[in-house]
Amino acid sequence: MLTMDDIVREGHPALREVATEVTFPLSDEEKKLGRDMLEFLINSQDEEMAEKYGLRGGVGIAAPQLAVTKRFLAIHVHDEKDRLYSYVLYNPKIRSHSVQQACLSGGEGCLSVDREVPGYVVRSERVTIDAFDENGTPLKLRFKDYPAIVIQHEIDHLNGIMFYDHINKENPSYLPPDVDVFG
C-alpha cells in the first residue's frame, strides 16, 4: 500500500523530467504500481483510512510523483453531477482541448507540494484524452470542468511541469477575462 512516504516532494528531479512512454505488454510492476496509485487515491478520500495512515486527500497522482519517470497516472474524482472518473491511464495524450478556459477558485494543490501556493492556474475547460488501459486497449476519454482540470494537472507531471508554473508570476491573482471559475 502506498503512503505519503512514497511520494516525492518538490525539488526531486523526477518531478522536472519528461517521463518516457511505457511499452506494451506492461510489466507486472507497472500494472501493480498503477493499481496501487488508484488505491492510494481511494484510500486518501476515505476519512478513516486517511486518518489511520496519515494520507493527504488526493484526486490524482502521476508516476513521477513516486520517482518513476514513466507516462502513467491515476485519477479518482467526481464531477459536479457526482459522476465518478476513476482510471489508471498509460501514455495519456491530450488530443484536443477547448478554447474556453477554467480554473479553481482556491487555486490548485499537489501531493508533492507541502505548502500553499496562491494564484490561479488557468487550464482548458474541456479536454479529450487518448490513452491506454493496463491491457493496452486504446481509450478516448472526454473530461470537462473539475475532472478536466485534474487530468491536465496530472499530464503536466508527465511533462515535468508543476501546477505553479502556470501561475502569473507578476500577479498571481490575475484572472483573464471569460475564464470560468469552479469551487
From Swiss-Prot:
Catalytic activity, as annotated: N-terminal N-formyl-L-methionyl-[peptide] + H2O = N-terminal L-methionyl-[peptide] + formate
S-S bonds: none
Binding site for Fe cation: 110, 153, 157
Functional description taken from the UniProt entry: Removes the formyl group from the N-terminal Met of newly synthesized proteins. Requires at least a dipeptide for an efficient rate of reaction. N-terminal L-methionine is a prerequisite for activity but the enzyme has broad specificity at other positions.
Gene Ontology molecular function: any one: metal ion binding
Family per record: Belongs to the polypeptide deformylase family.
Name used for this protein in its record: Peptide deformylase
GO BP terms in the entry: co-translational protein modification; translation
Active site: 154
Cofactor note: Binds 1 Fe(2+) ion.
SUPFAM superfamilies: Peptide deformylase
Keywords: Hydrolase, Iron, Metal-binding, Protein biosynthesis
Cofactor: Fe(2+)
Root EC class: hydrolase
A Pfam family recorded for this sequence: Pep_deformylase
HAMAP family: Pep_deformylase (MF_00163)
Enzyme Commission numbers on file: 3.5.1.88
Gene: def
